Amino acid sequence: RWKDSALMLEGEGVRSMTALFLQMWSVLQEPEFEQFLRPEVPAARAEGFVVPYGDCPLDGERVGEMVYIDLLNRARKYVHIITPYLILDGELETALRFAAERGVDVHLILPGKPDKWFAYALAKTHYKALLSSGVKISEWTPGFTHAKVVIADGVEAVAGTINLDYRSLYHHFENAVWMRGTDCIANMEADFQDTLIRCRRVERTKESIWQGKKLLHLAGILLKFIAPLV
């Protein structure tokens, strides 16, 4: 089975997302932007704030990672994350661990059945350190979850294309939407809890992490040396 998530955006934010796409496209050529930017359509009145943003690998700014780290550093109750990949650099791993160590409920849901065995192996190499700091990890047993969702304290959330791996955080063009106080945040948290019902909770033991897959364990150790390229 395959699980994903989607966010419907209306109003001025749509124009911002279009501009982000055109900015990426302009790396290859310089189109006439205005012909693609449709006149703004007034959106229905809604609560909260929505900020679309993008991350470009050519400018040296790690916007996607900084947003995630900021949410982790400011959270007081919980940070719930669904991500298909987990290949962390030192900064993001430290932020996840520190948030858990100061009492925040940091809980990650990852796929129970991978689409890429090497990414799956590398993800598991992070489990022991994260679990040791109190981070909770669950694997969605029905199949592969492709959603990229972060919910913090039921007040803020991010949904978009940005995985917790080097490709998304350093090498790819990505985009996402940061939200605060919007109605859909409660729906996102409800979906997280519903997804959790069909997950296997990973414990801090070698057997629970690797499930007896010795070749996968060995592959994870070896691939660690080239993790930034995977």
Where do the language-model regions lie?
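Charged, low-complexity intrinsically disordered terminal segments
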Residues: 1-230
